[in-house]
UniProtKB/Swiss-Prot annotation:
Location of this chain's protein in the cell: Endosome
Protein's job: Component of the biogenesis of lysosome-related organelles complex-1 (BLOC-1) involved in endosomal cargo sorting.
Protein name per Swiss-Prot or TrEMBL: Biogenesis of lysosome-related organelles complex 1 subunit BLI1
Record organism: Candida glabrata (strain ATCC 2001 / BCRC 20586 / JCM 3761 / NBRC 0622 / NRRL Y-65 / CBS 138)
Keywords: Coiled coil, Endosome, Transport
Similarity annotation: Belongs to the BLI1 family.
Cellular component per GO, a single term: endosome
């Protein structure tokens, strides 16, 4: 009798485990299909660049950064030049005033 009760418990436990495994497998399958569909949609929307094109874009980026740095250097040079010209203009104004007063 105990053996039968134990067997019933084992059978009930096995049924429960089988049911849970079935539900888990079903849920996993549904999520896998949904993820696969999502990946397909993403793949359609966003085309990946090939290695050559990515390399070319990288080189273009470096070239653009170098050009930008050159422009920044020129701007800095012209700003310094402007400051020097403003100082020279002030000196000339002072000299002009001194010359005008001495006449």
């Amino acid at each position: 009798m105990i053996k039968q009760d134990v067997q019933k418990c084992v059978d009930a436990l096995q049924d429960f485990v089988d049911k849970e495994i079935g539900e888990s497998v079903n849920l996993f399958s549904c999520k896998s299909r949904a993820n696969n569909e999502l990946l397909l949609n993403i793949d359609e929307k966003f085309q990946l660049k090939d290695k050559d094109e990515l390399h070319q874009l990288g080189e273009q980026k470096i070239e653009n950064q170098n050009k930008l740095q050159e422009i920044r250097n020129k701007v800095e040079y012209y700003e310094k030049l402007l400051t020097e010209l403003e100082e020279a203009q002030k000196e000339l104004e002072v000299r002009y005033k001194l010359v005008s007063k001495s006449k």
